[in-house]
Amino acid sequence: MFQKAIPLWHDAGLNTHLIFRADGDFSGAVFRIAAADFYKVYADGAFLGFGPARAAKGYARVDEYSLAACHEVRIEVAGYGCSSLSTVRQQSFCCAEIVRDGEILAATGFDFACMRNHQRRQKVVPISICTFYYFEFITNKIRIIPT
């Protein structure tokens, strides 16, 4: 499926959230992604998709999205690193590629910038097997804890 992309992850422990971003002229291209545990994709700031569909431990589904007039692709990946009712305990990763007419325009490990999402606090208490961790967002020194 992937010709050039390399699966990446920052091993910072449990409950890690990373952002991958690529800029360029991606008009008419196809975006492919496989990730664990969950991802959200944005094209030029507009929500494009969420995934992946569930798969057995050790397997990952590759999703494809068509990009129209697009110049920026941003992927937000949540890696919980624990078992729950919707995930298995496995290594988190993100592997993505943007291809147009057989030419690879961007691939993880080469063209995507990666950073940790510091808007979410990482070290929080797990709640239960149903809900992973509670989310604690950091916004201008005000702590918002959704229930």
Question: What residue ranges belong to the model's regions?
Answer:
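Beta-strand-rich recognition domains
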Residues: 1-48, 61-146
